[in-house]
C-alpha cells in the first residue's frame, strides 16, 4: 500500500524515551502533571513533550521531510509526587535548535505556549527550567548587575532601602515629588513609583519625572548620598516606553522601572538593552505574577519567571518577603533568591530547585523584599536576605505618625543597627527586638 498509517496515535510511542541521556545543550523542564482519570502518566508526559515541541495528534507527510529524532522534545523521566494522588513530576528535554537565540518570548511560546489547555491533562505546572550555558550566552541579561550597581551608588556592606510612594494613585506630580523628597532626605536610598503609576490624567509621566528628579537632586545635595527614584517607564507601546526612558536619562537620574509581565518579555528585553547602553539601572516589578504562579498545581512557578527575567534583563526584581503580607515560603523563596544572585546553584529539591543552574557570569539581580513589611521585620529581613537585597517599606515608611522623613529615619536607623549587630556576631533571630529597641533611643 502507498503512504503511511494515518489516524490518532499514542504520543508515548514517539515522545516517551526513558533511556534518553540528556545533553549539556538541552533545555530541561520539570512539569507537575495531573492527568485526566484513565490517562496513564507516560502518555500525559509524552503529550506535554510533543505539544511543546514538534508534535501533533497524527502522523503528517511532512514528518518525512525532517528529522524528528533531532528536533523532538523527549519525556525522559517521570516520578510520582509524594502525598498527592495522580500527580507526577514529568521531565522533558528540548534540543537547543528549537529556540531562537536571545528570545525569552520564543522560549516561553515553545515550552508553555500551547500545552496548558490540553484535554488529556487536568492541570499542568511548569516547576523549573534548566537553561544551558549555550543558550544563556545568547542573552545580555541584567543591564548592570549587583556589583556595578553598588559602584554606581557607592553603597556597600548593607541592604539598600526603598519605599513605594502611597497613595499610589491620585497625587498630583508636585505633591508626589514632595513625598519622594521627604523619604530620600530621611535616609532611604530609593523611592518607587507603584506598578500602576504610568501616565494618568491626574499625573502625566513627564510632570512626575521632572518633580521626582528635582526631589532626587535636592535630597542628594542635602545628604551627600546618591539617591534614586524608580521612574516607571511602562507604557502602551515599546516606542512610548523608550521615549520615557530617554527622558529619564536626559534628566540624569540613575534608575527606571518596568512591569515585566504585563509589559511582556519583548518590551522588557528592549528596555534592558537600552538601559545597558545608556547607563540606567532597571528595577523590575512582577505585577500579574500571582495570576500565573499562585496555584500549586497549575501555571508556572515564580522561580521560572525569575530565571526568565535574569535572561531578559533587570537589576532588581520583587521576590516576596517571607515575613510580610504576601505569600511565600522561606526555603522556596530563598531558592529563587539564590537563582537571581548567584553564578551557580546546585540542585536541591528541598528548596524547589529541580536542576543545577550555571549562569556563565551573567550578572546577578538584586531581590526586592516588598509588601507589608515594617521596621520590626528588619532583623528577620537582614538575616534572611543578607546584604545583596533591597528592602522596601511603603506603608512602613509613610505610615509613621510624624510623617515620611521620620519614617525613613526609623527604617535607616533600624537597618544600620541590625547590620552592625550582625557584624558584631549577635543573633538577629533571637535578639532582633532588643536591637531595635536599643536603636530607638
From Swiss-Prot:
List the Gene Ontology MF annotations in alphabetical order.
magnesium ion binding; monooxygenase activity; ribulose-bisphosphate carboxylase activity
What Gene3D superfamilies does the record tag this protein with?
A: Ribulose bisphosphate carboxylase, large subunit, C-terminal domain, RuBisCO large subunit, N-terminal domain
Matching entries from Pfam families are given as: RuBisCO_large, RuBisCO_large_N
> What Enzyme Commission number does this protein have?
4.1.1.39
Tell me which residues are marked as the site Transition state stabilizer: 325
One GO cellular component this record assigns the protein to is:
chloroplast
PTMs?
The disulfide bond which can form in the large chain dimeric partners within the hexadecamer appears to be associated with oxidative stress and protein turnover.
The UniProt record gives the binding positions of substrate as 114, 164, 168, 286, 318, 370
Residues bound to Mg(2+) are 192, 194-195
User: Which BP terms from GO are recorded?
Assistant: photorespiration; reductive pentose-phosphate cycle
| Localization terms from the record | Plastid, Chloroplast
Reaction catalysis annotation: 2 (2R)-3-phosphoglycerate + 2 H(+) = D-ribulose 1,5-bisphosphate + CO2 + H2O; D-ribulose 1,5-bisphosphate + O2 = 2-phosphoglycolate + (2R)-3-phosphoglycerate + 2 H(+)
Q: Which InterPro entries match?
A: RuBisCO (IPR033966), RuBisCo_large_chain_AS (IPR020878), RuBisCO_lsu_C (IPR000685), RuBisCO_lsu_C_sf (IPR036376), RuBisCO_lsu_fd_N (IPR017443), RuBisCO_lsu_N_sf (IPR036422), RuBisCO_lsuI (IPR020888)
Cofactor binding note: Binds 1 Mg(2+) ion per subunit.
Name the UniProt key words of this record, in alphabetical order. Answer: Calvin cycle, Carbon dioxide fixation, Chloroplast, Disulfide bond, Lyase, Magnesium, Metal-binding, Methylation, Monooxygenase, Oxidoreductase, Photorespiration, Photosynthesis, Plastid
- Positions bearing N6,N6,N6-trimethyllysine: 5
Query: Which cofactors does the annotated protein need, by name?
Result: Mg(2+)
The annotated active site, in chain numbering, is 166 (proton acceptor), 285 (proton acceptor)
Q: What PANTHER family does its record include?
A: RIBULOSE BISPHOSPHATE CARBOXYLASE, RIBULOSE BISPHOSPHATE CARBOXYLASE LARGE CHAIN
Give any extra note attached to this record: The basic functional RuBisCO is composed of a large chain homodimer in a 'head-to-tail' conformation. In form I RuBisCO this homodimer is arranged in a barrel-like tetramer with the small subunits forming a tetrameric 'cap' on each end of the 'barrel'.
| Quaternary state and interactors | Heterohexadecamer of 8 large chains and 8 small chains; disulfide-linked. The disulfide link is formed within the large subunit homodimers.
Q: Which family does it belong to?
A: Belongs to the RuBisCO large chain family. Type I subfamily.
From the Swiss-Prot or TrEMBL record, give the protein name: Ribulose bisphosphate carboxylase large chain
- This protein's species is Drosera dichrosepala (Rusty sundew)
Amino acid at each position: 500500500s502507498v503512504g503511511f498509517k494515518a489516524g490518532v496515535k499514542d504520543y508515548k510511542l514517539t515522545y516517551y524515551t526513558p533511556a534518553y541521556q540528556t545533553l549539556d545543550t538541552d533545555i530541561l523542564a520539570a512539569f507537575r502533571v495531573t492527568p485526566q482519570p484513565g490517562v496513564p502518566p507516560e502518555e500525559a508526559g509524552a503529550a506535554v513533550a510533543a505539544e511543546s515541541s514538534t508534535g501533533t495528534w497524527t502522523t503528517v507527510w511532512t514528518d518525512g521531510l525532517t528529522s524528528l529524532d533531532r528536533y523532538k522534545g523527549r519525556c525522559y523521566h517521570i516520578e510520582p509526587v509524594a502525598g498527592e494522588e495522580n500527580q507526577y513530576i514529568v521531565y522533558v528535554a528540548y534540543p537547543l535548535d528549537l529556540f531562537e537565540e536571545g528570545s525569552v518570548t520564543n522560549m516561553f511560546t515553545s515550552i508553555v505556549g500551547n500545552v496548558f489547555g490540553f484535554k488529556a491533562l487536568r492541570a499542568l505546572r511548569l516547576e523549573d527550567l534548566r537553561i544551558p550555558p549555550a543558550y544563556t550566552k545568547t542573552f545580555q541579561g541584567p543591564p548592570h548587575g549587583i556589583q556595578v550597581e553598588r559602584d554606581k551608588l557607592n553603597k556597600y556592606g548593607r541592604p539598600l532601602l526603598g519605599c513605594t510612594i502611597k497613595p499610589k494613585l491620585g497625587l498630583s506630580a508636585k505633591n508626589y515629588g514632595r513625598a519622594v523628597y521627604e523619604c530620600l532626605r530621611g535616609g532611604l536610598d530609593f523611592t518607587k513609583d507603584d506598578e500602576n503609576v504610568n501616565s494618568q490624567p491626574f499625573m502625566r509621566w513627564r510632570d512626575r519625572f521632572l518633580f521626582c528628579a528635582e526631589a532626587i537632586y535636592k535630597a542628594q545635595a542635602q545628604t551627600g548620598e546618591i539617591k534614586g527614584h524608580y521612574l516607571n517607564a511602562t507604557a502602551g507601546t515599546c516606542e512610548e516606553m523608550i521615549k520615557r526612558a530617554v527622558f529619564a536619562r536626559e534628566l540624569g537620574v540613575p534608575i527606571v522601572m518596568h512591569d515585566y509581565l504585563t509589559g511582556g518579555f519583548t518590551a522588557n528585553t528592549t528596555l534592558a538593552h537600552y538601559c545597558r547602553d545608556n547607563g540606567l539601572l532597571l528595577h523590575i516589578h512582577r505585577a500579574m505574577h500571582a495570576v500565573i504562579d499562585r496555584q500549586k498545581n497549575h501555571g508556572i512557578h515564580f522561580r521560572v519567571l525569575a530565571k526568565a527575567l535574569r535572561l531578559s534583563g533587570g537589576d532588581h526584581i520583587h521576590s516576596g518577603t517571607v515575613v510580610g503580607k504576601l505569600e511565600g515560603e522561606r526555603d522556596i523563596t530563598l531558592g529563587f533568591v539564590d537563582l537571581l544572585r548567584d553564578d551557580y546553584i546546585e540542585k536541591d529539591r528541598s528548596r524547589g530547585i529541580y536542576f543545577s543552574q550555571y549562569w556563565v557570569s551573567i550578572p546577578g539581580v538584586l531581590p526586592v523584599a516588598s509588601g507589608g513589611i515594617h521596621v520590626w521585620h528588619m532583623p528577620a529581613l537582614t538575616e534572611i536576605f543578607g546584604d545583596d537585597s533591597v528592602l522596601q517599606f511603603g506603608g512602613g515608611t509613610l505610615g509613621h505618625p510624624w510623617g515620611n522623613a521620620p519614617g525613613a529615619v526609623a527604617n535607616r536607623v533600624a537597618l544600620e543597627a541590625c547590620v552592625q549587630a550582625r557584624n558584631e556576631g549577635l543573633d538577629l533571630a533571637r535578639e532582633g527586638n532588643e536591637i531595635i529597641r536599643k536603636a530607638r533611643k
